[in-house]
Amino acid sequence: MASISIRCPSCSATEGAVRNGKSTAEHQRYLCSHCRKTWQLQFTYTASQPGTHQKIIDMAMNGVGCRASARIMGVGLNTVLRHLKNSGRSR
């Protein structure tokens, strides 16, 4: 069985990192026994993925409401509102 050395991003300790459950996206979460911080190696933030902004704008242009867009895209309502608010600005 292969062993992977996991380093705490907060205190840089290589010993004392233990598994601590899973995130809602099913990524392994770790806990540092030295500084008591938690982290995960993979992190998926749906709102920052490429194409999210354009999908939200397209849905708004097709008459889909803000709450429905948030529910369909799997992001928060404030994320949809922020993308719509910033859609007039040049990127």
Curated annotation (Swiss-Prot):
Pfam families: HTH_Tnp_IS1 (PF12759), Zn_ribbon_InsA (PF03811)
One GO biological process term: DNA transposition
Disulphide bonds in the chain: none
Keyword vocabulary terms for this entry: DNA recombination, Transposable element, Transposition
Entry-linked InterPro entries: InsA_HTH_dom, InsA_N_dom_Znf, IS1_transposase_InsA
Claim: Ribonucleoprotein is one of the keywords in the record: no
Function: Absolutely required for transposition of IS1.
Protein family (similarity comment): Belongs to the IS1 elements InsA family.
Name this protein carries in UniProt: Insertion element IS1 protein InsA
Organism, scientific name: Shigella flexneri
